[in-house]
Structure formats: C-alpha cells, structure tokens
Amino acid sequence: MPASFLFDGPDDARVTIMLAHGAGAPMDSASMNAAAKALAAEGFRIARFEFGYMAARRTGERRPPPKAETVMPEYVAAIDELGPTNGPLVIGGKSMGGRVASMIADSEFAAKRIAGLLCLGYPFHPLGRPEQLRTRHLIGMKTP
C-alpha cells in the first residue's frame, strides 16, 4: 500500500488524476514531475504514488520491477487510500504505471470508482521484443 502521495494542482479541482510511475523511475522523476506540473497547470489535481518495490528503494533496498500483474492490487489499494475526490477520478501512469492502471481500469470503472484512464508512454512490448505485445486486454475496453 502506498505510504504517501505527492499532490499537485488545486485541492478543489473538478477532476483528480492518479498517476503511477514507470518501471525504473520514481514518482518524482523528471518526466513524472513535468507531466504532473503540466496537468496541474490545466486545473487538474494530481495524486502520484509509488509501488512498494520503488518506495523500498528510498530506504536503500534495491528490487527489480515485478511483473505488472503483481502490483495490480497495490494500484487498487492506492485508489482506496486516496478516498473520495471532489469530482471524477481518472487513473493512469507512465509506462508500466499506465499499463497497470489499464489492467484494473475496467473493473474499477464498472464499480463506478473511476471515470477514465490516462496512459503516458504505454509499453506496447518488452524492450527489444516487438513480437510480445502487451495489448490484448486493451481490445474492447469500456473505460474512456
């Protein structure tokens, strides 16, 4: 479960966007900072969090990124921890974070816990293996 969030944007924003980091860079990396600041400048409230393996790196523990399926429950727990928002909640992330969000999006959308999905740099396949697509679950998605 995420220990803390980084927030950007107005507390009373009409839409909150929850973002998870990519496989190798934390929630406060240059690219995540830039994306959060740009979205906040448009009036969105941004809530960034880290998966457990990445948060552990802050205390010196180095673990490789787990499979996306492994951290799906952590994303759901982050939604729970964030709690009610002023308006609709959109989930997403950078690279692996966006992929994980996309993997839980339809169930969270069906449960009326989220209103949409935003992926920044979706990893369509593992590096150097374009034949191993990670897109099957995207076909027929119901989440906007």
Give names to the regions the model predicted.
Residues 1-89:
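Serine-hydrolase catalytic machinery in alpha/beta-hydrolase-like enzymes
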Residues 75-143:
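Primarily recognizes the serine-hydrolase "nucleophile elbow" in alpha/beta-hydrolase
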